[in-house]
Amino acid sequence: MYEKLIQDTVSEVLPKVVEWRRHFHMYPEVSGKEVETSLYIQKELAAMGIPFETGFFQNAVLGVIEGAKPGKTIALRADMDALPVTEQTGLPFASKHEGVMHACGHDSHMAILLGAAAVLSKLKDHIAGQVKLVFQPAEEEAAIGGGRNFVASGKLDDVSEIYGLHVWPELPVGVVGLRPGNLMAASDRFYVHIKGKSTHAAQLHNGTDALVMAAHFIIDVQTLVSRETDPMENVVCTIGLMKAGTRYNVGVEDAYLEGTVRTYTPALRDKMERRLGEILKGLDVMFGTKSELNYVRGHSATINTPEKIRFLQKIGKSYLGEDAVVEPQFPSMCAEDFSSYLQKIPGAFMWLGTGKEGTPALHNASFAIDESILPLGVTMEAAAVLEALGE
């Protein structure tokens, strides 16, 4: 309905979108420290005449565009934080902050949302309702809970639907991935401390070797995936860190392990937490150790509202072309705290393809998007609002 109008307006604001993306890329800030990023967003919103609110949660910014007539409220969301990664892209606008990089594309997400804001601000006479622009800190740090705290602030209580996106190197450039239901996994983290009793390595019968118990635990948890989980379900249980021992000829008194669990369903998530604890208790009895499990729940699974995905699929085919819209066959085991919004508000999360031969993965020090995808993201977000709220 608004194809020509949106396409022309996107073309008009595109140079600014590229400028925004490159600025964000040059000045990344990690979770909870997005101070200058927040101030820059505020400055750009003010320059567009878009009112905004801050101070309700860390460095979050909430912009508001009022349409010409009353109606429902739709939200668009972008995450703001970068990663503690030393950039190796060689880009002329590479990070100027040593050891910090936008290696997950959040620079693009913010630029796209500002671009959608620019388009919608210019076309607000066509809008019957309100648009909330959600600039969210701390997506990468589940302990802070950027999405969870934004929802808890109450600022989105009047929102009837919400949309967001993530650049996705596993899809080709120019393609938008739209999948109903499960899109991304729940991500939990666990910490294990195994307490034994140290002794001379030649007299291990006088002590309790925490390292041997840790080795058994590592092996035993693999059966949670291969022997205790329905093969039609998906789960990942990875132990990525183990620290144990002080010297080659001393039996190990303390062993520490850290790992992650990824699931798609609440029931399987609960089961994994319970079974990790039960395995530890059983091994304590077997080896005489004393163990502690600290299981920390992170982002929940990202589950798209099917109706909203169908809505976006129709928009994508109309605005970008039939071949530009794909439905990914499988969800990802990566996690996203857009899930926090979808637990309360109907909506959908898109994957914006940026993959071509040799494109590094997300979180890689050489990751960089193809900037030709920026207008596609702006178009999808702006069109979602206008098609839902347009007169």
Predicted feature residues:
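Acidic/His- and Gly-rich active-site-bordering loop/insert found
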Residues: Y2-H102, A111-I127
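Divalent metal-coordination and catalytic microenvironments
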Residues: F24, G63, L76, H106, ...
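Active-site beta-loop-alpha junctions enriched in small/polar residues
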Residues: E29, D79-D81, A138-E140, W168, ...
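A structural signal for isolated positions on well-ordered beta-strands in alpha/beta enzyme cores
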Residues: E53, K132-V134, E292
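Non-cysteine beta-strand/loop elements that form the S-adenosyl-L-methionine
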Residues: A75-R77, F190-V192, F349-T354
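Histidine/acidic-residue-rich, glycine-tolerant segments that coordinate divalent metal ions
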Residues: L83-V85, T89-M101, S108, L114, ...
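Metal-dependent amide/peptide-bond hydrolase catalytic core
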Residues: V212-E391
